[in-house]
Amino acid sequence: SEIMSKKISVLDISIDNFTAKEAMQEALAYMESDLVSVIELVTIESLMELGTEAELKEEIENFDLILAGNKTILEAAEITDHKCLRETEDKTFLKMFLRYLARKHKRVYLLVESEEEGQKMFGHFEEYYRGTQIVGMAKVSAKNRADDMLINAINGEEVDCVLSALSSPLQEELISKNRNVMNARVWLGLGKDGIPVAAKGIGGGRIGQFFMKQIFKKEIEKSKKRGN
């Protein structure tokens, strides 16, 4: 429906308020196109990190599909539609897309920030999305970025999808700067905690999430007072 497909703005970033099915239709079209399309699942963390990055925010406007990675973001935009909130909370689109990659034996390249995250991500595919061809994995750090080497590695593997689980603004900078030279169908930015990993040691994570939400809500209040 038209109402579902409208853009919402949260902390100056336009987000596509799509159902999982609508987002999936877009993603499937991207997989048929020769140019790399950029899908980003924004999280509270990424919105906060991008707060001061005015130039980067402009670049992000050029991404093809920007979806809310958690329900709090939709709530901040006063979205009350239960289906949208539930699908966002359940990561329905991400699961649909990963299932599609597995079913079609797509070639996927993983970007992570640590060895441990790489192992977790790889394990997640082994367990839930068998059939996906993981053709490469790279550890990317903001300190010693080697974009050329990374792009060459990706371009050498006939990649269908680059899955990025990097923190902001590293993730957004990386794709904004290199999308014109990258050979892949889809870049999917998941953010640092993007892959729904089986929860181990959830304590710290939960508390961290709680504080993050509080800070985020304060930021939203401030931006409402400023009138944007």
Language-model features and meaning:
Residues 73-146, 153, 157:
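Conserved beta-alpha
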Residues 2-86:
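N-terminal nucleotide/polyanion-binding subdomain common to many enzyme families
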